[in-house]
C-alpha cells in the first residue's frame, strides 16, 4: 500500500487553486494502477478493491481461454499439429507457420461392410487443403484447386488470382492461443465426426450406393495420432441406408464404416514440374497457363512422378554418369493380410523396376518389403506405399497414385490387389499358352507358376504407381515371326512394355519350344525409356520447367527417330488399330491365325484337363467361356482395322494415314475364314453336352456383330472419304465386293449346321444393306463400335454411301437370280427366292 499513500500525499500538497475537475481526473488516474492491487488481492487481502480493472488485451484473453481449457488435463500428442483430447472432445493446436501450408488429406476405409463393393484400404476421398486466418477469432479451411496459373511478375497474375478462389470447406473458432508458442487451439470433434466433403463419403458414392444422411448419435471420433509430418484420424461413421442396394444395410436401415483420414504436410517448396510430352505415356495434371505476352491461352500438363534425387554428396557422380542411390528410396510395403506364399512374388514384381531406374541413373531406387511389426505404423497412413490385399471376387488389380497438385510429385500409392485376380490369371494362361506349357493344364496351377503370373501383374500395377499409363501400342512393335523365334523372343520378350495388355505369347507354337522367358511379359525397352525420360535428374541445368521441356522435346524426337519401337500408342481407346488391348505383333491377322491353332488344341482338350471330382463342370464351363471370349478378342483385333487409320508421332511428316488397303483385305480374309465359315470347332460336343451351350445362337450373334461393323454407315463413310483423299486408298465399291465375296458363297448341302448359319448370315447382310438405303434412324454422331472416327449424320446422309449401297443391292439381286436357278435343294432355293422378294421391298419400301 506504500505506493498508494505516496500518491495521495502529492495530491494534498498541490496548490489550492486546482479545480475539482482536476482532482477528479487525478483520482481516475489512480484507479488505473493495477499490478500491485491484483497481487494483493490474489494474496488474500481483506480490503475490497472498488477500482475499475483494465480491459484485457485480445492476446491476454486468448491465453486465458487456452489456460482455462488446458488445466482440465487430458491427452496430449505432439506432431504436425499438437493433438489434445479433453473430456470427450478433440483439439488441434495449429502453429502460425502452418497457415497457408498445403496439406494432403486422404480418407480410406479401415473396415467396410459386406457386399459394399469397396474394401478396407481403398480410398474414398482425397483433397488438398490449407488453413487460413480469417480473423483473430476464426480459422478457415480451404480446398486447394489448381487449374490455371500465371507468373507473379505478370500483370495478368492479379486477374488469374482473383478468378481462382478456393472454396471454404470448414470454419473453426479459435478458442485460445498457447502462450508459449502462440499456437491456435481449435476444436475438431464435429469436423471429423460429421459428414463433410473432405473426410466423408463423396456425394457420388452415396448416391450410387443409396446411402442417406449421417447418424450423429452412432458416429464417433475414435482416435487422433500425431506424427512430425502428419496426423492420422480414425472415425466410425454411421449413415442411414433405407432403401439401399447393399443387402445388409437394407435389412437394418443403416450402414457403418471405420475410416482413416491422413493429413500430410506437403513440401513448402514444390518439386520442379516436368511438363508432359504426349509421346511418352505418363499420368499428368492439366492446367491453363496465362501470361502477358500471349496472344492465346496455353494448355500445359505436368507429369506425376516420385521425387527421386541423388544425395548432395553424390550429385557430381550422378551428373558424370555414375549410378548412385537416391536420397529417398521408393518403398512399397506388402499388406500382412496377403497370403504368405504370394508375398515374395509381389516383392519381386516391385523390385524388377530397378532395371529401368538404372537407365535414369539410379541404383536401388525402388524396393518392396514385408510390413514391419511396428505399432506406430498404419496401413492406411498416407506416408506409406502399400500393396493392399482385398478379399473380393473381382478378378483384377489396380495401381493408382496420389500426387501433389502443385507439382505432380507422387506422395503415396495404395495398390488394390483383389484376391480373385488369380482366377483371371489362370484362365489367361491356360487359354493363351496351354498348348505350349503343360503346367497350365490343371485345375490348380502350381505355386511357382502362379507366383510368376502374380509377379508380372505386380510389375504392371507398380508401373502405374510410378506414373506410367498403359501403352497399348507396345506389342505392335514386335514382328509377328519374331514371336516364334525362340532365341530372339526369349532375349527381348514378346512386347516392349509391361504397361501393355499383352498378357502372354499366344503366337508361339508347341514345335517352337519357347520357354517362359519368351511367354511372360517383362519390363521392356519402352518402360526403360519412359522411366529415364520421367526420372532423370538434371540439377540446375535448366532455369525452369519450360526450358527443360524444350530440351527434353528435342531429346525425345532424336530417340524416337533412332528407335521407333519406343512409340507410345496410348490407352487403346482411339481408332489406331495398332494400339489395342490384348493383341500381339505388327500383324494381328497372322498372329491370330497362329493363336487359333493353339486355341483349337486347348478347346479340344478342355473336357479332359478340367475334370472335377463328383462329375462337376464348374471349371469346364468357366474355361470354355474364357475360350469363347478369347476367340472374340482375336476377331475384334482384326475388325478394328476396317475404316480406321494409323496415328503417328506428332511432328512426323504424316501423322494420320489410312490403314493400307492390303491390310484391310487381310482382315476381310480372316473374318471370312475364321467366322463366316462358322467356327463349330469352338463348341465340341464333349463340352456342349455338359454345359448346355446354344451353339447356333452364339455363332450367329458373332457373325451379326461382325457385319454390324463391316457394313456400318460410319465405317463405310470413312472408307469413302479416304478414297477421295488418296488414289491408293481402298475404293468403297471394291471393299463392298470383297465383303460380298466372303458372305455370298454357295450352300453346301452336306453341312447342315454350316448351311443354316450361312443362310442366317446372308439374311443379316441384306438387312444391313436395307439399313444403309432406308435408314430407320439417323446415323450416329458417336464413334462406332469399331472405334473409327465419328462422322455427323448429315455428312453421312449427304455422301454417296447410299448410292454405293443401291448399286451393291443390284449385285446381290443378280447373284440371287443365278443361285436360285442353279439350286436344287428346296430349302436353299426358297431362301434365295425370299431374299429376292426382300430386295423388292428395299427398293420400294412401304410408306
Specify the residue positions occupied by each region the protein language model found.
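Extended catalytic-interface subdomain
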Residues: 403, 409-417, 458-466, 508-509, ...
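Bacterial Sec-dependent N-terminal signal peptides
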Residues: 1-36
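Solvent-exposed, polar/charged alpha-helical surfaces in well-ordered, non-transmembrane soluble domains
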Residues: 64, 344-351, 355, 456, ...
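Auxiliary tRNA-acceptor-end handling modules of aminoacyl-tRNA synthetases
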Residues: 35-338, 356, 365, 371-424, ...
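Solvent-exposed, acidic/flexible segments
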Residues: 339-346, 447-455, 492, 624, ...
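The catalytic-center signature of Zn2+-dependent metalloproteases
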Residues: 370-390, 452-509
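Conserved catalytic/binding loops enriched for acidic/polar residues
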Residues: 475-847
